[in-house]
């Protein structure tokens, strides 16, 4: 996999992120190289490979119906809201994959709380996060790539994944084999294979000088033995077939290898001579520059000593004035502290005085105002009227009660007389 060939270690990422910003006020910021601006693209590509190793397409994207991010999704600004939501979703999923319980963020959650929780989980893994949380609100940038890459590393560690060294394919050389044929080995077995092993490049080369010597020796032996006139008894058709069979095996191919140092020897010598010639001229310029710098430094040193000697009394006066200034500042700080305390006491006394004045004004206004007396008189008049009305009602009720009693008494007397008269009449009969 491509991620195995270009692995960015977490410590390297942390150093890169820490070098990209100052650690505090007054601290020197380390300048980065010209390629540091493109470092987050490399980190983002490694992050995509690690997410593929974690099978995020099946376990995250399809379940949440999300679109797979591009190889530079978090490195370039496209849609901040969508990128921030994707960042929070990926971070929560990676934290869960790393063995830590983490709730999946929702759209209505507070972004600051989500970022704070993610950074606290990142620090719990032992990773550094010394950048402001506002860097993650945009949803893109090197800090977003750094956080996701660290969480992906922790998730891979938790599942037991380890990076292996890349295995480069070995180029196999085509071995040219020559089939042995006992019918053709008539003279001293001239078709022997001579192979010379080269320990530098681990490849086999055929020694052409040996083949040439063998051919020359074969010709000499044949010329010595064949003194009489030879008569050919070979069939032309069989000879053609044999030539066609042996011809591919007689081809000697020597392949050039770019790794062989012999090809670059001439170029190395040319570069060496060029460097030596340039070094002679450059060395003279550098020697002259060194001498000039040395003389200038000596002049600067002597001038500095002269200035120090001339301004020594002024430096002493300056130090004395500096000491007096520090004492005056200290007295000023003490006096300023006393003034502040007295100002606070004055404000408290003024506040109490305002309260007393307000109370006095309220009491004076209540004493001089005649409105309460008028209200009391009106209430008394109203009470008298209500008393008169009540007396009248009581008299009416008493009169009505007396009339009812008299009427009841008269009715009772009439009833009594009515009952007595009939009894006397009955007695006369």
Swiss-Prot record:
Subcellular localization, as worded in the UniProt entry: Cell projection, Cilium; Cytoplasm, Cytoskeleton, Cilium basal body
Domain of life from the UniProt record: Eukaryota
UniProt-listed InterPro entries: Intra-flagellar_transport_57
Membrane-spanning segments: none
Keywords, ordered alphabetically: Apoptosis, Cell projection, Cilium, Coiled coil, Cytoplasm, Cytoskeleton, DNA-binding, Transcription, Transcription regulation
Chief localization: other
Keyword rRNA processing among UniProt keywords: no
GTP-binding recorded as keyword: no
Region (Disordered): 1-26
Tissue: In retina, detected in the photoreceptor basal body and connecting cilium. Most abundant in the inner segment of photoreceptors (at protein level).
GO molecular function: DNA binding
Pfam annotation, one family: IFT57
One GO process term, biological-process aspect: non-motile cilium assembly
Location of the region described as pDED in the Swiss-Prot/TrEMBL record: 335-426
Coiled coil: 305-369
GO terms for cellular component: ciliary basal body; ciliary base; cilium; Golgi apparatus; intraciliary transport particle B; microtubule organizing center; photoreceptor connecting cilium
Assembly: Component of the IFT complex B, at least composed of IFT20, IFT22, IFT25, IFT27, IFT46, IFT52, TRAF3IP1/IFT54, IFT57, IFT74, IFT80, IFT81, and IFT88. Interacts with IFT20. Interacts with IFT88. Interacts with IFT80, IFT-81, IFT74, IFT172, IFT70B and KIF17. Interacts with BLOC1S2. Interacts with RYBP. Interacts with HOMER1; the interaction possibly prevents the pro-apoptotic effects of IFT57. Interacts with HIP1. In normal conditions, it poorly interacts with HIP1, HIP1 being strongly associated with HTT.
Domain observations: The pseudo DED region (pDED) mediates the interaction with HIP1.
Function: Required for the formation of cilia. Plays an indirect role in sonic hedgehog signaling, cilia being required for all activity of the hedgehog pathway. Has pro-apoptotic function via its interaction with HIP1, leading to recruit caspase-8 (CASP8) and trigger apoptosis. Has the ability to bind DNA sequence motif 5'-AAAGACATG-3' present in the promoter of caspase genes such as CASP1, CASP8 and CASP10, suggesting that it may act as a transcription regulator; however the relevance of such function remains unclear.
Family statement drawn from the similarity comment of this UniProt entry: Belongs to the IFT57 family.
Stated name of the protein: Intraflagellar transport protein 57 homolog
Species whose genome carries this gene: Bos taurus (Bovine)
Native organism taxonomy: Eukaryota, Metazoa, Chordata, Craniata, Vertebrata
């Amino acid at each position: 996999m491509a991620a195995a060939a270009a692995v960015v270690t977490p410590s390297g990422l942390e150093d890169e992120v820490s070098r990209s910003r100052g650690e505090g006020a007054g601290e020197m910021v380390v300048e980065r190289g010209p390629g540091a601006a493109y470092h987050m693209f490399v980190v983002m590509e490694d992050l995509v490979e690690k997410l593929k190793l974690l099978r995020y397409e099946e376990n995250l994207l399809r379940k949440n119906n999300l679109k797979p991010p591009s190889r530079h999704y978090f490195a370039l600004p496209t849609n901040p809201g969508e990128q921030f939501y994707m960042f929070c979703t990926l971070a929560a999923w990676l934290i869960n994959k790393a063995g830590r319980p983490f709730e999946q963020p929702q759209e209505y959650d507070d972004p600051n709380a989500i970022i704070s929780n993610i950074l606290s989980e990142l620090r719990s893994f032992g990773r550094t996060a010394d950048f402001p949380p506002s860097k993650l609100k945009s949803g893109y940038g090197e800090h977003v790539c750094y956080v996701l890459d660290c969480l992906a590393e922790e998730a891979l560690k938790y599942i037991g994944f380890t990076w292996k060294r890349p295995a480069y394919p070995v180029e196999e050389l085509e071995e040219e084999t020559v089939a042995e044929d006992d019918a053709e080995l008539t003279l001293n077995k001239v078709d022997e294979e001579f192979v010379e092993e080269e320990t530098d490049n681990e490849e086999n080369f055929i020694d052409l000088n040996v083949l040439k010597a063998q051919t020359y020796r074969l010709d000499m032996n044949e010329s010595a033995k064949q003194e009489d006139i030879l008569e050919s008894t070979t069939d032309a058709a069989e000879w053609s077939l044999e030539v066609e069979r042996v011809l591919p095996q007689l081809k000697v191919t020597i392949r050039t290898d770019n790794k062989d140092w012999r090809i670059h020897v001439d170029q190395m010598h040319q570069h060496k001579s060029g460097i030596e010639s340039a070094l002679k001229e450059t060395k003279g310029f550098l020697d002259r520059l060194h001498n000039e710098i040395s003389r200038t430094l000596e002049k600067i040193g002597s001038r500095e000593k002269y200035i120090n000697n001339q301004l020594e009394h002024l430096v002493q006066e300056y130090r004395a004035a500096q000491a007096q200034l520090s004492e005056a500042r200290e007295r000023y700080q003490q006096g300023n502290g006393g003034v502040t305390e007295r100002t606070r006491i004055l404000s408290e006394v003024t506040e109490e005085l305002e309260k007393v004045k307000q109370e006095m004004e309220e009491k004076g206004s209540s004493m001089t105002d005649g409105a309460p007396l008028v209200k009391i008189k009106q209430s008394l008049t109203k009470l008298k009227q209500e008393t008169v009305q009540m007396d009248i009602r009581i008299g009416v009720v008493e009169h009505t009660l007396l009339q009812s009693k008299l009427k009841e008494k008269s009715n009772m007397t009439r009833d009594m007389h009515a009952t007595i008269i009939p009894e006397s009449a009955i007695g006369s009969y």
